[in-house]
Amino acid sequence: ELMNKLMASDYVDYDNAMAVKFQQAILSLPEKQRIVFNLRYYDELDYEEISRITDTRAETLKVNYHYAKEKIKEYMTNN
């Protein structure tokens, strides 16, 4: 029984660990990038909808989303 407890305590849910790391990556983004990333990725809004919500030009949002994706990739690779 002790061995089972020890083995169970060493169990790592890698899917959950990756999800936590992904959330940490998102939280590390500058606010503007984080907002556009969340609205685009999670809420699946198009740039025109996000533009109306944030009062920001769609072109600017596209740039922010691009940089957000790059920073998330970098975070996931290096941390």
Question: How would you describe each model-predicted region?
Answer:
Residues M3-I35, L45-I53:
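Amphipathic alpha-helical segment used for protein-protein interaction
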Residues Q33, L39, E48, I53-N79:
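DNA-recognition helix of helix-turn-helix
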